[in-house]
Amino acid sequence: MNKPKIFTTSFASVYPLYVQKADKKGRTKEEVDTIICWLTGYDQQALQRQIDKGVDFETFFAQAPQINPNALKITGVICGYRVEEIEDPPMQKLRYLDKMIDELAKGKPMEKILRK
């Protein structure tokens, strides 16, 4: 089975789009980074290294130090799919990130986005 194209897309090429989406709604790059680090376990320096290396999404998530256990609390629909029902773990992680960035752009408070 072929991998979805997004997995071979570099994280660095999509990252600015996440920041741009947040910025358009008055949110910050720092908030985007906080979300990414919360979900993946990367610290700020490791996140920047992954961006600088141009790793693809598959590698980005495969090398993530630890997916936050509270990611299981992320529910809802993104790209027409319920994130909690996605059976492919790499795709589910990607959709978790999409969902959280979407919530940020919709003005949700960080405490709720980070499932605190």
Regions found by a protein language model. Name each.
Residues 1-116:
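A charge-rich, low-complexity, intrinsically flexible signal that marks solvent-exposed coils, linkers
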